[in-house]
Amino acid sequence: MPGDSPVVSKRAAPKPRRAAMPGDSPVVSKPPDGAGPGDKAGGLGKAAAQMAAAPAAGKKLPRLPKCARCRNHGYSSPLKGHKRFCMWRDCQCKKCSLIAERQRVMAAQVALRRQQAQEEELGISHPVPLPSAPEPVVKKSSSSSSCLLQDSSSPAHSTSTVAAAAASAPPEGRMLIQDIPSIPSRGHLESTSDLVVDSTYYSSFYQPSLYPYYNNLYNYSQYQMAVATESSSSETGGTFVGSAMKNSLRSLPATYMSSQSGKQWQMKGMENRHAMSSQYRMCSYYPPTSYLGQGVGSPTCVTQILASEDTPSYSESKARVFSPPSSQDSGLGCLSSSESTKGDLECEPHQEPGAFAVSPVLEGE
C-alpha cells in the first residue's frame, strides 16, 4: 500500500564465538539464512564450483584448451574459434616466439610419423642413408664388369643427380642406384656433378667372346675344329692324320677338346661315318673358308680323301693337306670336293649329336 512503510530486512546478529580449545575438532560454519545481493553472487560462484567438483570425482570432464598467447598476456580465452580473432597472433615477444617454435617442431614430428607409417605400409622399413662424404663407388657384378664413379676435380656445376641403371646386366650383378644431391649453400662446393664412368661398365651390355670365332647366337662357331685321333687306330691314314692334328692342336684349350661325356672326338677307320645332328646345321655370317677354326657346328663335313693315284708319298700329302693358312689361325687345311682329288664326300646324320667321327677314304686297293 502507498501508506505502508518500507519493510527493512533484519539480519540475524552473529553469535559470539568461544575460544577454540586444543582438544576440539574444527567446526564448519553454515551460511546465514538471509543473504544480500553481494552475497548472492558469491553464493552462485560457490554453487557452480561445488557442481563442477561433484562430477569430477566420478567422471572426468573434457579438456577445454585456452589460447596460449592470450594467457601470456593475462587473458583467458577458449581456443575453439579464437585463432582468427586473437589480438596477439602476430606478437613477436619472447614467450610468443617460444610458442611458434614449439608449433613448428610439433608439426615436423607429425609429418615424420606419417612418413614412417607410409613406409611401413609399403614395406620400406629402413631407408638407405646417403654417404656424408662423396667417395668413389665401385660395384662389381658377377660378369666381372665394374662401374667406377669418380669425382672430378673441377667444380663446374652445382647440382646434379646421377642414376646408373644396369637393365641389360644379369640379375646376379645388380647395381646400386644412388642419388647424390648437392647443397648450394656449402662453403666449399664438392663437385659431385662431373662423374666419369669407366669403359668396363659398358662391357656388361655386350661382352665379346674370349675366342675370335665364337660369334654365333647359340655359341656355335662357323668353322669346324680339327679333332684328335684314337691312339689305338691301326689304319695308316688315321695314324698319319692324328700326328699332324696333335701338332696343330697344342694351342687349343682343353675345354673344346672333349665332349659332354668326357671322351675325345676320334677319327676312326673305314666303318665309321662323319655324324652330325640337324640342330648344329646353322647358317654362318661369314662365307665358307678353306681352313678350320675353333669350335664345332659348321654345316660342312670334313673328310680326308687319300687316293693312291694322287698321293705318291705321305710327305707330299701332308704338306698339301695340312698347309697352315697365312693370316689368322694355325688351323688345318681342308680338301673340298672341287679339288682334283677323287673321293666321295659322305655326310650322314647320327642319333648322337655329341659324337663326331671323320673317316678317311682309301681308294685304289
UniProtKB/Swiss-Prot annotation:
Tissue specificity field: Expressed in the genital ridge and Wolffian duct prior to sexual differentiation and is expressed at higher levels in ZZ than in ZW embryos.
Major site of localization recorded for this protein: nucleus
Residue ranges: DNA binding: 63-109
PROSITE patterns per the UniProt record, alphabetical: DM_1 (PS40000), DM_2 (PS50809)
Subcellular location field: Nucleus
InterPro entries: DM_DNA-bd, DM_DNA-bd_sf, DMRT, DMRT1-like
Composition bias, Gly residues: 35-45
Low complexity compositional bias, start-end: 141-170
A molecular function GO annotation: metal ion binding
GO terms for biological process, alphabetical: cell differentiation; male sex determination; regulation of transcription by RNA polymerase II; seminiferous tubule development; sex differentiation
Signal peptide range: none
A single Gene Ontology CC term: nucleus
Polar residues bias (residue ranges): 324-340
Keyword tags: Activator, Developmental protein, Differentiation, DNA-binding, Metal-binding, Nucleus, Repressor, Sexual differentiation, Transcription, Transcription regulation, Zinc
Domain of life of the native organism: Eukaryota
Gene3D superfamilies named in the record: DM DNA-binding domain
Stretch list, region Disordered: 1-47, 120-170, 316-365
Basic and acidic residues bias (residue ranges): 341-351
PANTHER family registered for this protein in UniProt: DOUBLESEX AND MAB-3 RELATED TRANSCRIPTION FACTOR DMRT, DOUBLESEX- AND MAB-3-RELATED TRANSCRIPTION FACTOR 1
Other comments on record: Knockdown of DMRT1 in early embryos results in the feminization of male gonads, affecting tissue organization, gene expression and germ cell distribution. These experiments are in support of the Z dosage hypothesis for avian sex determination or at least, for gonadal sex development: according to this theory ZZ males would have a higher dosage of DMRT1 which would initiate testicular differentiation and expression of the key conserved Sertoli cell differentiation factor, SOX9.
Family of the protein in this entry: Belongs to the DMRT family.
Entry function: Transcription factor that plays a key role in male sex determination. Acts both as a transcription repressor and repressor.
Descriptive protein name: Doublesex- and mab-3-related transcription factor 1
Organism name: Gallus gallus (Chicken)
Gene: DMRT1
